[in-house]
Amino acid sequence: MAAVPRLRPIDHEERLTLVDHLGELRTRILVAVGAFMLASSVAWWQNHEVLEIVYRPLPDNIPEPITFGVTEPFTTTLSNSAYFGLLASLPVILYQFYAFVLPAFSPKERKVATPLIAMIPFLFIGGVAFCYFVVLEPATDFLLSFNNDEFNTQIRARDYTSFVLLTMAAMGIGFQVPVAILAAVRLGITTPEKLRKNRRYAILVIAVLAAFLPTIDPITLILEMVPLILLFELSIVLSAALQGREAKAAAREAEAVEAAEREKAPDSPS
């Protein structure tokens, strides 16, 4: 009888053969791919609603995007379904990756990694939502109305959906700033004091990264920078608070050990 595939995290002390590791990897890849295919199938089934969501940021005076050629309606709908499927299945994919690499972490590293991994899908969805509800509408309005007296503007569906979904994905990735900073602080790579001291360079890096997003106008650039800077500042506050709590816990533990040693020590002769 074939062995039951593993779907649980392996303990740090557990030792597996190469074949066992490959079987574990295969199972988790199948689960991740299955989740992606299921979510993409649902998005394909509800493709009309998906396209309505994508088209909503367009200004009212702009007609619906157009397609060219016989196959483009099919391929555009297929790519939209894949993008939405990836977004919906991301928590499952991240968990499968985390569960596979978890045995390589020591117990101390696992205490750092577990809460940070749990933050990733929520921050990603937060970035996507911020982009959709705050950034996309002013961005499309500005870009489509710019010098519009000189152009007969028509939007190609494939280009527009790629623009929207790429911008949303980029903002979702950009919202991972707290994960990167907290991980660096917890692993001793940097400190809150160094982050505060080099704040100006961090803001410059954020501005450069935001400039590479598909929305190239200055107004949208500011809209994209503001939450990233706030997340950077929040990360400094959180990392400082965590460091302070850990320092207090270490001090209490040292005091408890010292008190226990005093109790065990024999009484001095009178």
Task: Name what the model sees in each region.
Residues 1-270:
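Membrane topogenic/interface segments and analogous intrinsically disordered interaction regions
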